[in-house]
Amino acid sequence: MNQLPEKLLAKGNEAIAMAAIDSGCLLYFGYPITPQNDIPEYLSKHLPALGGQFIQAESEIASINLLLGASSTGARAMTSSSSPGISLMQEGISYLAGSELPGLIVNISRSGPGLGGISPSQGDYFQATRGGGHGDYRMIVLAPSTVQEMYDLTCLAFDLSDKYRNPAMILGDALIGQMKEPLIRQTCKKMDLPPKDWALRGAEGRKPNRIKSLYLQDGELSEHNWKLYEKYEQMKKEEVRFETFYAEGAKLIIAAFGSMARVSKTSMEMAREEGMKVGLFRPITIFPFPQKALFALSQKVKPFLTVELNTGQMVEDVKLSVDRDAQVYFYGRPPGSLPSPDEVLEEIKKVYGIEHSA
């Protein structure tokens, strides 16, 4: 490994793989699928030289269960896939959450439903933010919009996952995963984390640890689920992250995440050059969603335009978050093509004209 910090040109997928190594993750389990294959390719070359393990499993189902086993020993471990592969992992992710085990899952999402295609999509928002598998659980979900954030948020995701003993997800897409941008690779900032005294590392001289998600005694499962609920509420209080641009004094706020936040930011700048007071609200954590921040903003600014690379998913969280008097408009593009900044600008003009005409 080169001496850090190091400035280089890298793909978003490669940035995730580098951050995993720099976060102390030496265990990777996965199965190939486009457009995330740069992640396992990079790690297959570098992990063995660092004393780590790279395992190409026979399926995504096997991959997530290998992650569960590795995590139960207290090791940092990860997997990555793309939309249909993530769907195959849902049972295992539910078991991770139910067993209170950390672990990083990366979804470089692609078009669906079904086999779909390999173009970028934000159609996995509901699956990521609502749990996805069976049972009443949530994942920590971070949504990068740059290659640098692919690196930085991967470092953060490992720490948050360990802090809360809960699976975390990086929700990217084919655009950010495949694009190249300047990247500053540096030592990951690490939280002060508690020891993993729950891990299965042998029981000489102490009572054995047990990791499970099966609770059959009267009231036991209910108590466990309330414990998980309190953990998710703590995440909402402590881990919300978002970014705003020109929100102060704006007369229209665009809400967008990930790759569409990039497009929307350019459209916002074009609109401002034409004299329109337009701002941008970008959630970085999509679970926990920045509900309170959006509500506070909606008391000053109305209306909102939610822009997504799907037919309408995050817009539901925006509507639930804003003041009841705030109008929320939606502009979406089904997977298969990416809207240009000019196309989003036309929608901005349309909404701005409706709301601010004489």
Task: Provide a role label for each language-model segment.
Residues 1-131, 138, 146, 334, ...:
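Thiamine diphosphate
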Residues 11-15, 229-252, 265:
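Glycine-/acidic-rich phosphate or pyrophosphate-binding loops and their flanking alpha/beta elements
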Residues 44-46, 94-97, 155-160, 185-188, ...:
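Short, solvent-exposed amphipathic alpha-helical segments in soluble enzyme
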Residues 120-173, 356:
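Conserved thiamine diphosphate
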Residues 165-244:
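Conformationally flexible catalytic loops at phosphate/diphosphate-handling active centers
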Residues 242-276, 281, 287-293:
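Redox- and metal-dependent alpha/beta enzyme cores, enriched for Fe-S-associated oxidoreductases
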Residues 308-358:
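Peripheral docking tails and interdomain loops at the edges
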